[in-house]
Amino acid sequence: MNQIGFHNFRKFQSFPNLDLSPITIFVGENNAGKSTVVKAILSVLDFLGTEIGGGDDLLGLRFFFNKSFFTHVGTFQRALNNSAKEGVITFTASNGLYRIQIEMEGDKEDEQSISAQISEIVLTILPFNIDLDYKFKSGQDRLIATFHSTPSEYYKDLSAPYDTPAMRENYHKARVKYFKDMTKDIEVEMPISNGSLSQGRIIEVLLDHFYSKVEATVKSLNNKAIDLFSNVLIINGLSKDAEDFLRSKRALLLQKPFVELAKNDVARRASFGGFEYIYAHAVTQTVIYSAKDINDYFVRTIHDFANQRIEKETEVYKFIVRWMKIFRIGIDYEVSSFGGEAHIVKIKNSDDRIVNLADKGMGSIQLMILLFRLASMMANAGIQSPGQRRGDYTIIVEEPEQNLHPKLQSKLADLFLEMYELYGFKFIIESHSEYLIRRTQILIAEKGFKSDEELKDFAPFKVIYFPGDDKEHYDMLYRTDGKFSNEFGPGFFDEAANLAFKIF
């Protein structure tokens, strides 16, 4: 995900589209809205990752607020902004390949309703700037496909998921030819129609539905055949412009690279990638970690990691040991399992002494849990070597600086940067750590960006400040020298200086 926006959700009546960087850090006052943005992201990712199809009906799609354990929303009424005039919530998100807007309606007076009816979804295929506007309201249900004649402002070539140089070249040629031939926007209206759906995530299903409509329509036009009894063929009602467009673009719409490449990476990208929420959690100095305590995030992380059975000399193992040394936790580790029902974690210190993880400080325990969770995600993504960017994962971390010495807080920035640059994982961080923020400034300065444009396109970090008092959030905006163009609100960076001034 590289963009999120919403209306009438939780704290915000309107939250304008926010562009996310590979590592986006939310800072600011308490109750300023950081958690609302995180809940919005989690809610959207959960919806996009849900499998539909089979017996499901496109016209009956619903958005559930009680499926994600992490969002803690539960009902539509709790999700809806208190000042909303109508029971309508809208989310907008993008991942560089697709942009999706989801509108839902619910009963604002119903305290028990756990879902809302999807009233409209606008899915944009960004490389070709095609809007698929699915209107689901009863009596108004239809698909309006708009083929734009100019590229989308939201699409950047550098953000597209190319697997090979050849694929990139084919994709580029197809786009150039497509827009060169387009002289004006073309709108094609089609009935949605009930019926069986392909199995998959929502974006996959909508794309399959769209392509099947286009294929049937183009073939019917080509054969000059109209099947009035089919709920797929939609020749009647087409404008002359739409007919001419579909006829002239037959080769492109039905053959490679449009269909195959536009659908390429759908399996990985349709849900906007995998995600993990590492929320602020307690740690305990317990020697044995029982799998029966699986509802405890701390214990579940150890249990999940143990089940990965990470072997020595693998990239994941090297990652853990490398960062254990950087964080001064130890120089090696061992996880022992008892019938898969309980685990013990041992740490090897720099003096070769073996101790239980429970005998380390709370900060070291906290960091090992973070490393184990990141390592599990690396293993799930099939990471086998540095530079193998299997990303498409968004990791949301809440207050990772808990229990950490300031020096170690700053090193978290290096950890997140390595996870992105070497392995492709993206992060959204909720933090109050001045030391973490200061370290990102140094890392930006060390990149040596030559211009503001280069900085904007390639800076790995972004810091968003939430000032509270219902004031609008803003981007702190790094400069090429690492300094910020904007100022933090009072009580963040200046609090230590203010207290020192009072002492003197």
Protein language model regions, located:
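Switch/communication elements of ASCE P-loop NTPase nucleotide-binding domains
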Residues: M1-N81, E86-T92, E313-F504
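Residue-level signal for secondary-structure boundary sites
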Residues: L97-R99, T286, K471
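Generic alpha-helical secondary structure signal
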Residues: I102, S138, L158-S159, A166, ...
